[in-house]
Amino acid sequence: MFGTNWKAQAGHGGFYQAVADGSYKKIGLDVDIQQGGPQMNNRPLLAVGKIDFLMAGNLLLSFDNVKNGVPTMVVAAIFQKDPQAMFANPGQGDDKFSELAKAPTAFMSKDGQFSFWQWMKAEHGFKDEQLKPYVFNVGPFTADKKSVQQGYSISEPVSMKAQGFDPVVHLLADNGFSTYSTTIETRAEMVRARPELVQKFVDASLIGWYNYLYGDNKAANEMIKKANPEATDANIVYPPPRKLNCKRWVTTPGN
């Protein structure tokens, strides 16, 4: 069982591709994908053996596991550059990332607060007094023109633009947040006891990602839409998956 950290979307496409085109089966693996979401946190399920592999957003929560003695390991990373971003309302003078630290309100999820928010405080002067919970609804952000909000640069802007709203997008990676993203994590015991299985899963996942970016990804996209009815053709193909190319986002052999 492979668990993701959020609802099915194009940013998870390579894993769905590996199921859809048989990349996992060809290497002897029978893989089911359990999507995450507001009501499904897959991270604690990994440590207790309810899932075998986890897709994580960035390395900070993985570091936190190490700090707290949770026996998990990162075995691969798909994205070299994290698509995590902060959004600002247009026309508010927030064209520079440094200006966001002055916003009275920052809508942030719990996971965000425990991971990249800590970096934002340490490196850019954000303060906990700014925090309000992000409930994965952009309404409060668009209504409060002085607020800022976390988001995924290849996800939320699509729904916002469909509503006629074009946010100012600041990639954390362009402002010093250096971490791999869309990582594959498993239990340390799995790496020790079944290294060949771990290697097979990583290899087949990378094949799935290559095929998703450069091959026929229609079947994978249909799986995504079936798993997550909020996923539409419009937000799956924007930005087009092939724009998430190896030079910018995805690790390549030898890198």
Predicted regions and their residues:
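Short, glycine-/small- and polar/acidic-enriched structural segments
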Residues: 1-143, 147-151, 170-171
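Short, solvent-exposed loop/beta-turn-alpha elements that line the ligand-binding surface or hinge
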Residues: 26, 99, 172-177, 192, ...
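Alpha-helix/helix-capping structural signal
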Residues: 59-60, 154-155, 189
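A bilobed periplasmic-binding-protein/Venus flytrap-type ligand-binding module shared by bacterial periplasmic
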Residues: 84-94, 181-196
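Active-site-proximal catalytic alpha-helix in oxidoreductases
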Residues: 150-151, 179-186, 202-209
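Extracytoplasmic/periplasmic substrate-binding proteins
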Residues: 153, 157-174, 179
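Secondary-structure end/capping motifs
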Residues: 192-255
